[in-house]
């Protein structure tokens, strides 16, 4: 069910080859394997080496935006036709450059509990994550995204017992804030990530999307730091493309005053640690140590 839904959007035929670029202990890595089996196509597995070498002969790959940026900047000779992007905001400049080199970019929204992708689309620079794929249902209840799908897990295994995934109404409540417009889902952010500064609510993901639009930004995270006067203030942790820029000046006419970071820090390599996602908790702890 997972593979069928994704491949209803992304062309992947029996002559195509998807690089196993993600670990199989992560649902996104398992998703590559399911799509390979469903399509009767090929899947390439290689020992760890530079990404350009790993992609030799591959038509499809699951990457994070930073990896695709580097391939494009280096004008790497690859045979890619399509890339499924995840893990960070996707700048429109990135997808446009990829399209110029014949690479279609897709993005979406998924969860481990749903065997990965729930909604997806061809990346277009807009904030939404696309429409529900076949076999998936989405609704918004009190600003929270609720889901159910054919690919949904039966539950969690805890203390020798299966704990149901769904609530009394038969839906999985995600704890994600979302909106539906014209059948397309927009993820505003995690309900757990919302914080207040001087009485104003700040959703980190909303601020991150604005900052990520700058061409020098590979990825950015907004972290709340305690403040005696305001309760919390936003700090930005940024991974730059080659060199730093004055983003504080750049965001002045793009973000409300209370949303503008009071401090800009560069993302340290140790927090990336080869993972698919960067831990917000680890970011908070690192920022606190910078004082």
What is the meaning of each model-derived region?
Residues 60-63, 71-127, 137-139:
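Gly/Ser/Thr-rich phosphate-binding loop
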Residues 1-74, 82, 106:
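AMP-binding/adenylate-forming
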Residues 285-291:
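Acidic/polar alpha-helix N-cap and adjacent early helical turns
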Residues 61-64, 83, 87, 138, ...:
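Residue-level signal for inorganic ion chemistry
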Residues 17-19, 146, 237:
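Short, well-ordered beta-strand segments
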Residues 85-88, 109, 148-150, 198-200:
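Glycine-rich beta-strand-to-loop/alpha-helix junction loops that act as flexible
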Residues 149, 175-259, 271-274, 282:
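AMP-binding/adenylate-forming catalytic core of the ANL superfamily
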Residues 131-134, 141-170, 200-202:
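Conserved ATP/PPi-binding loop(s) of AMP-dependent carboxylate-activating enzymes
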């Amino acid at each position: 069910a997972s593979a069928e839904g994704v491949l209803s959007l992304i062309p992947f035929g029996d002559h195509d080859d998807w690089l196993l670029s993600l670990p199989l202990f992560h649902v996104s890595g398992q998703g590559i394997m399911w799509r390979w089996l469903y399509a009767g196509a090929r899947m390439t597995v290689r020992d760890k080496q530079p990404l350009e070498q790993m992609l030799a002969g591959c038509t499809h790959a699951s990457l994070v935006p930073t990896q695709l940026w580097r391939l494009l900047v280096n004008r790497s000779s690859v045979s890619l036709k399509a890339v499924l992007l995840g893990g960070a905001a996707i700048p429109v400049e990135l997808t446009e450059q990829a399209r110029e080199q014949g690479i279609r970019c897709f993005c979406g929204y998924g969860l481990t509990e749903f065997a990965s992708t729930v909604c997806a689309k061809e990346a277009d620079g807009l904030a939404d994550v696309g429409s529900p794929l076949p076999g998936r249902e989405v609704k918004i209840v009190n600003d929270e995204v609720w889901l159910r799908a054919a690919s949904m897990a039966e539950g969690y295994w805890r203390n020798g017992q299966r704990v149901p995934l769904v609530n009394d109404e038969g839906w999985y409540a995600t704890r994600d804030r979302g909106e539906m417009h014209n059948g397309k889902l927009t993820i505003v952010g995690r309900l757990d990530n919302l914080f207040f500064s001087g009485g104003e609510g700040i959703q980190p993901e909303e601020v991150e999307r604005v900052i990520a639009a700058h061409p020098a930004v590979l990825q950015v995270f907004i972290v709340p730091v305690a403040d005696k006067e305001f309760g919390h203030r936003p700090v930005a942790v940024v991974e730059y493309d080659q060199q730093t820029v004055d983003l504080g000046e750049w965001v002045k006419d793009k973000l409300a005053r209370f949303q503008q970071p009071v401090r800009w820090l560069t993302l340290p390599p140790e927090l990336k640690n080869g993972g698919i996602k960067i831990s917000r908790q680890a970011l908070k702890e690192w920022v606190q140590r910078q004082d």
